[in-house]
Amino acid sequence: MKFKSTVIAASVLAGIMSLSAGAYAMGGASGAHVNYPTTGKIGAVMMNPYGIAPLTAVIRNGGYSLSDISVRIVPKDGGQEITYTVSDAKARTHGGIPIFGLYAGYRNTVEVSYTKTTEGKSERVEKEVYRIYAGPANIATAGYAGVTSVFPVAEVKKVDPAFSDRLYLINNMIAATPNTTRAVWNNPMGGALEWNRYPQNAIYDTKGEIRWYMEPSKIYDPNNIYMAGIMMGFRQNNDGAFTWGYGQRYVKYDLMGREIFNRQLPDGYADFSHAMDPMQNGNYLVRVASADHARPDGKHVRTVRDVIIEVDQNGTVVDEWALWDILDPYRNNVLKALDQGAVCLNIDATKAGQTITAEQLAELDKTDNFGDIVGAGAGRNWAHVNSVDYDPTDDSIIISSRHQSALIKIGRDKQVKWIMGSPEGWGPKFADKVLKPVDKDGKPIKCEGSKCEGDFDWTWTQHTGWRVDSKSDKDVFYLSVFDNGDARGMEQPALPEMKYSRAVVYKIDQKKMTVEQIWEYGKERGHAWYSPVTSLTEYYQDKNSVDRKSVV
């Protein structure tokens, strides 16, 4: 108590001294100077400048033009160093030197080098040191018994030296809380509005330390249906900024948390999830659904995960792919084999291992039961598109349809170019579009139904069917995909422990309409590596590596 009294007295005394000296009173104008405290040769440090990235800061320019900027976040003992340069444009945009990669709950040491210029005079500053404390990582948590930390705690098993500079964005969410999943659509019914979870997004270094996280309260509100949803589809664009979507929004922010755009979906569409892909032409492919679809039986419904739109940088919808008009929404081969206990993020352990029959699907289609449920026809989850990519060589899109267990290439003319999936049930319209498996010598592989000889296998309830741009051309298409493995072979196994997942890369000869499996990983890991939902596989050219993230 005595210490606190001393501090208060000193504060009051300082205020009296300032007033007696003729300075402006606290709260008044500062005059021809800036009275923020500074520790270096430029301006003050502003923490979390845009309100959503607490482990960022800006060292303000202090009225100078800054150039030739470099930044080093000094690592903890045994920690991972983060270094980067800052363009003049970025320094102007942020009003100073952007700082990224601070440790949470720690007094960071940051070294910056720069040239400052004013009135034609320049000064070079090398390795100026700032001590910047960032508070502990903290966002909302769920009150469930199993929750023991704000963010997942990373357990680092092994780090190859060649990958020690990596940073990993973890796109996560907390389990459904009582203030989420409380609303459904009306006028018309259907859709997937109840897909709403509190976001938990962070960047980890290779030591398992959080170096960035999102504090989402400025952009996410579980009580506002147009500001809620599940944040998914994070992609880093060529300009370094991130795009993603959630619920009724698609957005773009830079790493500092600066909003580039945050838009509500165009009014004819609803329920973003999974995929927002930046195209080479500057537009975006966004996986949505229809907000009002008139079915052949006259019923109006909101559809579920079966529409892709192309939007330009101004938000104009320049094209759409309505999949019920392109594919067969009543192909039910995979639907009948799905494990009803784990349909993407809709987990119901009481239905584990259960399947649905053709008769049940037919009866369901006669009812008014629409929405995020497995079923045939528009208005139910017949397609479940969980990724979309673009091929600039022929102006086509590639979709991953979980509930058709197929990767499908579709042209701008809305015609199917090829289907990478088991051939059952596609009918005469699409039979010649199904790719033929071949071995490394180009010889056909014998397949009966959904089972093929040797190591070749199709993908089952897969995710992230992405074009490997650095290896593909107009004739040869390299496809990376995460094969989740549910309903493998169009059936449920005798024991759930027989299920497994794979990261796979295929080589498709688009002229010969053949597919070769050139790499896989995961089958040898068995059920321990099985991921019934979500997950991804992506090739990285810089280290000739494949990144695999899964939910196990």
Regions inferred by a protein language model and the residue ranges of each:
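Gram-negative bacterial Sec-dependent N-terminal signal peptides
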Residues: M1-Y24
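Low-complexity "stalk/linker" and mucin-like segments enriched in Ser/Thr/Pro/Ala/Gly
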Residues: G78-V86
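Histidine-/acidic-rich catalytic cores in large beta-rich domains
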Residues: M26-K76, R92-G96, F100-V552
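Short beta-strand segments within Ig-like beta-sandwich modules, predominantly Fibronectin type-III
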Residues: V86-R92
